[in-house]
Amino acid sequence: MDSVSAKHILVDAEHEAQDLLKKISEGSAFEDLAQKFSKCPSGQQGGDLGEFGKGRMVPAFEEAAFGLDVDQVSSPVQTQFGYHLIKRYK
């Protein structure tokens, strides 16, 4: 697999990411939560980062994104930017 398409939600603290993950598991839409809570400008587009290949994202983020199945949401992933929830959509 050379590339994936993913969305993400970026927050400051792991407990925030865990709270959002719980909301997703209870049926909240990932995209709605990204618009409301993500610190990343992509939040306004539902967290959509589009398609990206290997070497384009920081290693921890890339490893998590490439390890997901389509429509799967990651557990919180820590990078130098904060904590991410990642949803692969393609």
Please place each PLM-identified region on the residue numbering.
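Well-structured core secondary-structure elements of compact alpha/beta domains
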Residues: 1-26, 41-57, 86-90
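Proteostasis/folding factors centered on peptidyl-prolyl cis-trans isomerases
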Residues: 1-10, 36-37, 60-90
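Solvent-exposed, polar/charged alpha-helical surfaces in well-ordered, non-transmembrane soluble domains
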Residues: 15-22, 31-35, 63
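Charged, alpha-helical scaffolding/interaction elements associated with membrane systems
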Residues: 26-27, 70
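Generic macromolecular interface patches on structured domains
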Residues: 30, 43-44, 75
